[in-house]
Design a protein with these regions (language model features):
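Acidic beta-to-alpha connecting loop that harbors the catalytic carboxylate
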Residues: 85-88, 100, 128-129
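Short amphipathic alpha-helices and their capping/turn segments at secondary-structure boundaries
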Residues: 12-17, 67-76, 114-115
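Short beta-strand/loop motif that positions the catalytic acidic residue
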Residues: 75, 81-83, 96-97
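Active-site-adjacent alpha-helix of alpha/beta-hydrolase-fold enzymes
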Residues: 90-120
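Active-site nucleophile elbow and catalytic-triad environment of alpha/beta-hydrolase enzymes
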Residues: 50-72
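Catalytic active-site module of serine/aspartate enzymes centered on a nucleophile-bearing elbow/loop
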Residues: 110, 116-156
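Conserved active-site and cofactor/substrate-binding residues in soluble primary-metabolism enzymes
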Residues: 53, 57, 104-107, 142
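Alpha/beta-hydrolase-fold enzymes
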Residues: 1-54
């Protein structure tokens, strides 16, 4: 990824609409859905089991936004950045998908969230899935408690 994404971003002005698959794994969706290993029900026509293809233009936009964050922002309002304590990879479902982020690199979130501004509260959620509030009840209850406590400390 450290070479492919910048390369895709470089060719985007010339080939903005090339469709790129994101993979063929349904493992994360299986972690959420009650019919597999999760506890949730949702419309699979709206929240797909497989991630849809993206375009070179989309990848370039994400990469450029990430570079902006890497270089630092100066957000003046309080920011709460929450992320799991580990990332999970793989094409086949395993129990690890129930306790980690199968979408994002949590090390990058931990590293770069501090670049958002001067009033950043970060929460590393032990055992959190990508959708933290879809994690197991004990995990999401900890997240809710933290969010409400944090909200009570900020003034709008």
């Amino acid at each position: 990824n450290e070479f492919v994404i910048p390369l895709v971003s470089f060719i985007t002005p010339f080939l903005p609409d090339i469709s790129i698959p994101q993979g063929a794994s349904t493992a994360y969706a299986e972690s959420l859905l009650k019919e597999f290993h999760g506890e949730w029900e949702f419309d699979k026509d709206k929240k797909l089991m497989l991630s849809p293809n993206v375009t070179t233009d989309w990848i370039s936009a994400i990469y450029n936004a990430q570079k902006t964050v890497w270089n630092g922002l100066d957000i003046k309002i309080p920011v709460l950045a929450m992320y799991s304590d580990n990332s999970v990879n793989g094409n086949k479902w395993s129990i690890e998908f129930m306790h980690g982020d199968a979408v994002l690199n949590v090390k990058d979130i931990a590293k770069y969230s501090q670049n958002l501004g001067n009033n950043i509260q970060r929460l590393k959620v032990v055992g959190g899935m990508h959708d933290l509030l879809c994690s197991k009840p004990e995990v999401r209850n900890r997240v809710y408690r933290f969010v409400f406590k944090w909200l009570s400390t900020i003034s709008c």
